[in-house]
Design a protein with these regions (language model features):
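Contiguous segments within soluble domain cores/interaction surfaces
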Residues: 1-106
């Protein structure tokens, strides 16, 4: 069995006050079903910038994510289901870790 390290990825959402919203992370990869990532912490600064740390891609260990390109999309959603902000990052997934961030989205 492959032993995976725990990848950490930071995404930042700007321009919206995310206080009180639920933040969800979705990992998408080449025509496969999207996978929910675990959002472990959300911090806010004085300018309502939120930094979310994804400390665990829960399905990497079961083969849900494969080597190669993937996109992580971050969505903040109000209790009423309204989406406030979205941020995306393209990543390169290696044998047992995230190799690098390829590009920043909006």
């Amino acid at each position: 069995m492959i032993q995976w390290t725990t990848p950490t990825l930071r995404l930042t959402v700007r321009g919206a006050d995310l206080t009180g919203t639920d933040v969800h992370a979705t990992i998408k990869q080449g025509g496969r079903d999207p996978i929910e990532g675990e959002v472990t912490s959300v911090t806010y600064d004085a300018e309502a910038e939120a930094t979310v740390v994804l400390a665990d891609f829960t399905q990497v260990q079961t083969g849900g994510i494969r080597k190669g390109d993937a996109t992580v999309q971050l969505n903040s959603v109000t209790a009423e289901g309204k989406r406030l902000a979205t941020s995306e990052k393209r990543i390169e997934v290696g044998d047992n870790h995230i190799k690098e961030v390829l590009a920043y989205g909006s």
